[in-house]
Amino acid sequence: MTPARVVFICCVVLLAAAAAAASSSTAAGITRADFPPEFIFGAGSSAYQVEGAFAEDGRKPSIWDTFSHSGYSVDGATGDVTADQYHKYKEDVKLLQDMGVDAYRMSISWSRLIPDGRGAVNPKGLEYYNNLIDELLSHGIQPHVTIYHFDFPQALQDEYNGILSPRFVEDFTAYADVCFKNFGDRVKHWSTVNEPNIEPIGGYDQGILPPRRCSFPFGVLSCDNGNSTTEPYIVAHHLLLAHSSAVSLYREKYQATQGGQIGLTLLGWWYEPGTQDPEDVAAAARMNDFHIGWYMHPLVYGDYPPVMRKNVGSRLPSFTAEESKRVLESYDFVGFNHYVAIFVRADLSKLDQSLRDYMGDAAVKYDLPFLKSNNEFPLGLTSDFMTSTPWALKKMLNHLQEKYKNPIVMIHENGAAGQPDPSGGNTYDDDFRSQYLQDYIEATLQSIRNGSNVQGYFVWSFLDVFEYLFGYRLRFGLYGVDFASPERTRYQRHSARWYAGFLRGGELRPAAAALAGGGAYSQ
């Protein structure tokens, strides 16, 4: 390590310590009343991760059922039962009410509602989502509904290779129509798709997510088929066209009478330069264009970012004039799932390679903490990659404010994970999570005061759930779930008690005595 690097790291550590001290003092008096009156606080989950009942009442497999049953998640975990919300939704809604949230972010399982992906609607699936939505509303909780959250119907995957085919756009629009028609009288906040800027990379470049398509030498896992140099861009294009098609349908057919809002939800890593070398600064900006701008640029300006057009070339699909017009401003809000900052450096040599995937086109290199080796998780994944970097949230929101016309933003996911109690018991003490959430809620308020148009914040997650590749090794829940119990017993963690107190008017960072009992934190 060079002396300059040592000095740089020492400066970063000192600045971080000073920032933490300042944060503790400035946030002490913050309460919910400091946020705009209509600001929404909530918590979330998604269908495959929380529902269970994977083969009950007419539901058919999604690509995540196929993937997890093939053993690709840690410990061979699946979402077959998970937290069993399908059978316990009334209990869960009562917990949400007790916590005092304004809203619950949920998703609909396409293969539960329309088991074959198109055609007949499953009456039992329709009944379940009607019951859940009605239960939420009867307890004063707004349903914020995602139409597609990774769980694509396996039937359509088998029929035409799923999202890789343009046929997906028509089928998704028809599925969205069923959702709007049956639930839109009560659902006023719709997200079309969740994290469409990560599914193409994980599923069609690296092969670590379903449907496991990739090509040598880019796949993290070996894949039977795919093309990592082209398919991620095709899939992202189809997701964007499907989103805009569903938005057009909603606006033309439903919005005037139902009075709801519609958008989509992006993953919002923030890319930061690893050094202040101009090439590294440019690399971070380029990576933010490839990550956030991949969707925001078409939504705000009608086409992909110029740097993507330049670097990807003919492999990047083009919009027709009609498609560009439809994509442009096809949102009332944009959701962001934000957790961490990632540091990158330039690697312009990648642009000289004859074969390039997404990372090659971005021409950056980075050492993601979750690519460390010699750990217990598959694919080099570790549990410590979500360190607290609230400054990154502020930078991301400022970026949206300055570059993308300051859209209405809903922070749809933000949270911290812990591992299960090694003794086999239930982990109640999760003060690290409370601290993490306090940091990010304060950062959200600071961004609002700086002019960002943030209108909601949702903790990920309401309950412990099936965390995809991590299975049940990572627990994000405000409420824990005893997965060893057939009843999937819920239990309140310290963070749930703190969040409830804050939502009832308590201070963001209460004194220990306040948390011990009495007042807003008495639950």
From Swiss-Prot:
- Top EC group: hydrolase
Q: Which reaction is recorded as catalysed by this protein?
A: Hydrolysis of terminal, non-reducing beta-D-glucosyl residues with release of beta-D-glucose
Annotated signal sequence range? 1-22
EC number(s) on record? Answer: 3.2.1.21
Q: Which Pfam families match?
A: Glyco_hydro_1
In terms of domain of life, where is this protein from?
Answer: Eukaryota
Cross-referenced InterPro entries:
Glyco_hydro_1, Glyco_hydro_1_N_CS, Glycoside_hydrolase_SF
Q: Does the keyword 4Fe-4S apply?
A: no
Q: Name one GO biological process term.
A: carbohydrate metabolic process
Q: Which residues are glycosylated?
A: 227, 450
**Catalytic residue positions:** 195, 413
Q: Which residues bind a beta-D-glucoside?
A: 49, 149, 194-195, 339, 413, 460, 467-468, 476
Q: What is this protein called?
A: Beta-glucosidase 31
Which organism does this sequence originate in? Oryza sativa subsp. japonica
